[in-house]
Amino acid sequence: LKVGVGLMCRHSRARGAMADKIQEGAIGDVVLMRSYRMHGPVASARSIPQKMRNEYKDLEEIRWQIRRFHSFIWASGGCFNDYYIHNIDECCWMKGAAMGDPEHTGGDPLNVMGSLEKWSWPIMAQATGGKHYTKNKQGQPYVDQNFDNYSVEYTYADGTKLMHYGRTIEGCHNEFASYIHGTKGFGTFSKNGHWPAPSALYTGLTPNPKNQTWKFPARETNPYQDEWDDLLDAIRNDKPYNEAERGALASQVCNMGRMAAHTGQKVMWDDALNADPLAPDLENLVGFDGDAPVKANADGSYPAPQPGITKNREY
């Protein structure tokens, strides 16, 4: 069985070379990583009531929710998991999470590394977030379960921080990038989306060309294509290839951050693992003829996060 999970940045040759340099000590000890995905609403992150959209008004509710999957936490983890996982995962990679071939996923921290301090995924998250705008320009209410801005501080067992900033609001400053800071230098590994990825290292704290100590030496290939090339090569040549655990671990990091923002609480790794289910009735889902795992209120709205009020689950 060969399993790819769609984290295409992990297949970037430029990022891979940079991750190796960082693990060799090129910027000293890693102390901080920053990731940003801030732009206007995209895909199905914003939804108005089903009955207000002619193309959806006659669909079964479950089918509509799947069509608008970014709007529902049960269906996708919301825009947080679907959008931000790539930036967050590539930062964890630079820290050393799941280095090497796809079979080396990271696993349990004590079993694999022997010491919790060397666990290269975050163990805690605290976050803020909210929904600034509750209606579109036509005055129609948004009924999705997403916030339109998130700020998350992840903490590693050794004290390293990963800061992530996400926003889906029109008219604001846009940034789509990831950076890493060490005791001896600074690095950039995405600057304007997931590709191209101008991976480079510098002395100091800024990407000053005069202080550049390394950059990816080859012509960069497209990681969206590379992930397929790698999977198909494994299939054709029967190479070990299973990204499932690594993808699950990256998803769990996202779950921690999203839950921290939606509940207003600090969330530890085990808290996220043992949290109340996102959709208590999901196991009863039998198809498009059954009830949706989350049901609309009379006005078409859905249960939404209430930080500080709903503390033990997200909605």
Per-segment meaning from a language model:
Residues 139-140, 159, 210, 300:
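Intrinsic-disorder/low-complexity loop/linker signature
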Residues 58, 62-63, 76-113, 120, ...:
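C-terminal helical cap and adjacent loop that interface with cofactors, partners, or active-site loops
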Residues 1-3, 160, 238-240:
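Short, surface-exposed connector motifs at secondary-structure boundaries
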Residues 157-161, 184-185:
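Glycine-centered tight beta-turn/hairpin loop motif at sheet-sheet or coil-to-beta transitions
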Residues 137, 159-169:
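Flexible, glycine/threonine-enriched loop-and-boundary segments that flank and lead into catalytic domains
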Residues 1-143, 170-172, 177-179, 186, ...:
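Predominantly a Rossmann-like dinucleotide-binding segment in NAD(P)-dependent oxidoreductases
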